[in-house]
Amino acid sequence: MDRMCGFRSTEDYSEKATLMMPSDYQSLICSTTGDNQRLFGSDELATALSSELLPRIRKAEDNFSLSVIKSKIASHPLYPRLLQTYIDCQKVGAPMEIACILEEIQRENHVYKRDVAPLSCFGADPELDEFMETYCDILVKYKTDLARPFDEATTFINKIEMQLQNLCTGPASATALSDDGAVSSDEELREDDDIAADDSQQRSNDRDLKDQLLRKFGSHISSLKLEFSKKKKKGKLPREARQALLDWWNVHNKWPYPTEGDKISLAEETGLDQKQINNWFINQRKRHWKPSENMPFDMMDDSNETFFTE
């Protein structure tokens, strides 16, 4: 019927010899360049068409070659191992939900390869065999390098948690657990009774020790208390005595050097001894008195003699 109508049979197009492969595109363009020039009559148009078609043809060739390589890798016997090592690398440090998704992808791919995709044999492509083996080994080493810091961190955290747990619990606060993991009420009561008994025994021992110390050192303690109470507190003089000394100072502020008779009368008035009176006047002169420039030299001489006498 096709021949009667002037058409060629479809069987003529089924032969590989009649099909054009992507690699034949370039030769076809080169062989027809002259015809295109004659057909269109313009060199610029031919150049424009060639520059537009060549990238598309090269892209088609690259895509075709990439598809062929992918199909070869996917049908290789080592592809399941390659996928396994790749997923193991992705699972290092990944959250639990991401790890589950990766495992599901691996199971689905395994089912697809088993039921649908045919596998090639070793030796069919030695270069691809070497590539697959090398890449699998690289991924295994990469996974080991990735997992090392995570394993070290996990070990360190577990060690710290154990130390903290030991510090928080300790042997003194450790309690016995029942079969269901809870502390039984009977054991709690017994522990409370033991603690109360220990406290009572400790208080009784303290009282006994205190009584023994009082019986043995009571007299010494009493004598020490009496001796401490007799000692006068060091520091400021009594208020009345200090006021009497200040009154004498204000009257004799031009020459605040009391005579021996003045000291005796001040001692009788204040109840202080000679040493306390001398010390008070020495400190008072150092802090609050400065000799006048118009003071006679003979008074200065007398003051120096009195000062050294004190």
Curated annotation (Swiss-Prot):
Residues 208-228 form the ELK domain. It comes from the Eukaryota. Keywords: DNA-binding, Homeobox, Nucleus. InterPro entries: ELK_dom, HD, Homeobox_CS, Homeodomain-like_sf, KN_HD, KNOX1, KNOX2, TALE_homeobox. It is found in: Nucleus. Residues 229-292 bind DNA. Residues 178-208 are annotated as: Disordered. The keyword Cell membrane does not apply. Belongs to the TALE/KNOX homeobox family. May play a role in meristem function, and may be involved in maintaining cells in an undifferentiated, meristematic state. Probably binds to the DNA sequence 5'-TGAC-3'. This is Homeobox protein knotted-1-like 2. It comes from Arabidopsis thaliana (Mouse-ear cress). The lineage of its organism: Eukaryota, Viridiplantae, Streptophyta, Embryophyta, Tracheophyta.
